[in-house]
């Protein structure tokens, strides 16, 4: 547990007097835990080397080293350091780009007995000079291609160039240099109040303590892949490095080009299967949890996070909010997100092991629970102090009045204990702020600006932009006009990028208090009218217009010209990344480094590149060929094919504005062309027609039920009536109803299934929220750019159906059809009446904890996907319930497979579902492990996730079509719909609890028209709602007793839980042929190979 003292705190908080303080202290600071207190960082690393020498230790791009290889190289370099006089507490500056060599250098310094001083290669010359001078580093380790950075720097120590040829000739065994855990490990420079940065001295023992915390509290193991995101000058890099190298995990170095592109970053995380990453909240806010699949633990640190950000991620990952100054070895407290609703702020949690937290007044007297005070920290992670700053050290590291003989670090942060044992961060007491995760002392920025020959007074303050991100604004008094660019250039010569103010505002004089001090409250809010903006010049072409639109949105400024400077308008590196990300949606590419070099649109436009073709953005009209799933629908000849809908009901406590909704749905139906379909009979065939914008495109009804005591029944009845009113030939296929009630509004939407599917609903919810928000703020409704139309998909799919590449799939389907028997499942009664009105439902659900294991832990055992697990459980259940060893079922998929080159349907609304036969083979049901692996391999062998089966059946030209009998008639249908409820919850609306009449919704209740036919004997649907897995079994009551289906449901749950427990308990990941792309290798053959290997290695 990350917070073991919570219950004790609650018990102790109501005591009185001195005894209360003792109880209180014991409760909140009872964090003592064993850790290797006598061991240094490099000794702990060497232990991992001896345990797992061949495990991958570190990866950068296409280069990687095992633990053994990394250790050898570090030992070789350490010997060079020792020869050149590096020893105990000797400081070595490290100025290298992110690379494996950088981390070899750090380990080598520690192994030699020294301490390293990280220096960012992007620091201005003056800052590099100051750090080297102040630290009195005996040596500077750098790379050959960076030597130019120190040509103009006065450095009296040795410069060591990292060269592989020089290093590799040295002895590579461990050195055994005498060292203690209280030796200095590193000195990190952070912003200081005197105008210069200050160095904080950290000892080995703080990291030794964290090693146990990583393993026991964060559950990091050798199987994890740790992302290395932070700059070397930021102590988060120390956290990332040793989270991996002291636990046997692998460290993945993420380069700047990847970090500066949100799309690239998300792709990298997935491709490298990163499992644990630490990021500033200001970066996470631009990432999409739906697109990042491998992360299991997300840690945010460096600045305050928000409840909305936590809510966005907590269902997908273990979300941890961490807090800790550099002076306390990176981390002092952590908070783990739970299922409970988060209040107005996100806590920073409770103290980690061997750490004590005290919230005190100015006299170091404890504050009561709920009272604000200064947060002070004690424990094993405390720094030795500030390098060569004894006075500052004595001010900040004071005697601990609660533990004699120990020190206490006064953070300058204001906080308070909450009643549940967590801490709420309330801000700073002094003028220190956090910008993009970095500590910034405002006085340091002010003192640098005062060095300018024409500036007589200055004040720097922090503000928040329209995205609630902090930025700096500098106010100055000068008798002369100083060009903005000159000020930025002047600042950049001494300050790192994150400390350069976003705004510079020249004042005639500073506002003063009655005491003659600068009155910061009276400083004007940053506004372009105070800036030094050039005359407005309008965009001249489409790309410049696009850039203007994106800049206005990202910077929150209404009117931007092509001569305006991005940074003068409040831009920074994070906003530059946002600009690059937004350009992706326009199929345009920008390197963020170009925006740094060319900060005006008229300069930048020359460096914008086309990334790929754009989808047609016009209105789609005309006849469209039916896709396979639509062919299937009309082939069924349902009694009432007009009533075959999907529907949703949304709820908004504050109500919906009818006029806004009309504008929003007009835009949505215009934007998503498929919603305007109708279907005509012509010459014995069904013709699909995409209407233009003429006529009625959706029906909208309003009901005022504010005075009605039976609102739920009325809503159900009216919804059912609307469900039954859709006409495929006349249209529209979209029906909307707004129900006003005393407690808020319910918004009903019914759309015929022919033009919508589960993914389409996600798109529609997103667009509904976006458009409604825009309209509420009197903005023009602007939806994301269209992807390829349903019409284009249909055309290209028909071409694909007759392509040589596709026809190669025939062999698989031919074999499946000829060698698979149709097996009928047992039934209680014989009936020919398969109407929807006879359908009943039985359901089962897992707990939140069981579901979390299924989603986050199970797949690691065999590298499975969730369908592999759910279908294996179904196979076991059917075996037990009906004594069937082998049965074919119908499996549904989303159907949006990437089979058509250059075709993009990511945001296209329509019915794309695929369905295909899958065999559940349970002939070795006594071997759980084997059955999981067999299910996985059988599913992986299906070409392109089954989309081809019905393409052959309905689209391939008859003379090309292989001889496929299509004789398989599954009686069971299975469809896992995913985590659907989270897509409905937005800040605007949530899912309504009220019934919508008969609909084919994602809850598995496929009632449809009561007179319509049921097309499977058993229809099984799975979905996640409120953190729980739900499985529903729909059946015909004239075929089955309820108890019979209950037996199947219970059996399914029992086997699913057994599989979850089996996988969670399994320590090692077991690979199967598909993990190696061995398409022809059978599972048994691979097991034999592994057995042979195991025998040969023992």
Curated annotation (Swiss-Prot):
Entry EC no(s): 5.1.1.11
Q: Does the keyword Transport apply?
A: no
Alphabetical GO biological process terms: antibiotic biosynthetic process; lipid biosynthetic process
Which cofactors are named for this entry? pantetheine 4'-phosphate
Pathway assigned to this chain's UniProt record: Antibiotic biosynthesis; gramicidin S biosynthesis
Write down the superkingdom of origin: Bacteria
Q: Which UniProt keywords apply?
A: Antibiotic biosynthesis, ATP-binding, Isomerase, Ligase, Multifunctional enzyme, Nucleotide-binding, Phosphopantetheine, Phosphoprotein
**GO molecular-function term, one example from the UniProt record:** ATP binding
Q: How is the cofactor bound?
A: Binds 1 phosphopantetheine covalently.
Quote the InterPro entries the UniProt record gives: AA_adenyl_dom (IPR010071), ACP-like_sf (IPR036736), AMP-bd_C (IPR025110), AMP-bd_C_sf (IPR045851), AMP-binding_CS (IPR020845), AMP-dep_synth/lig_dom (IPR000873), CAT-like_dom_sf (IPR023213), Condensatn (IPR001242)
Q: Does the keyword 4Fe-4S apply?
A: no
User: Looking at its record, which EC class is this enzyme?
Assistant: isomerase
Q: Which residues carry this modification: O-(pantetheine 4'-phosphoryl)serine?
A: 573
Domain (Carrier) ranges: 538-612
What reaction does this enzyme carry out catalytically? L-phenylalanine + ATP + H2O = D-phenylalanine + AMP + diphosphate + H(+)
| Record comment regarding domains | One-module-bearing peptide synthase with a C-terminal epimerization domain. Each module incorporates one amino acid into the peptide product and can be further subdivided into domains responsible for substrate adenylation, thiolation, condensation (not for the initiation module), and epimerization (optional), and N methylation (optional).
What job does this protein perform?
Answer: In the first step of peptide synthesis this enzyme activates phenylalanine and racemizes it to the D-isomer.
What PANTHER family does the record tag this protein with? ENZYME, PUTATIVE (JCVI)-RELATED, PTHR45398
| Description of how the protein assembles with itself and partners | Large multienzyme complex of GrsA and GrsB.
Other observations noted? The racemization reaction takes place in the thioester-bound stage of phenylalanine that is formed via the thiol group of the serine-bound phosphopantetheine.
Protein family membership: Belongs to the ATP-dependent AMP-binding enzyme family.
Q: In its UniProt entry, what is this protein called?
A: Gramicidin S synthase 1
Native organism is Aneurinibacillus migulanus (Bacillus migulanus)
Gene name, Swiss-Prot/TrEMBL: grsA
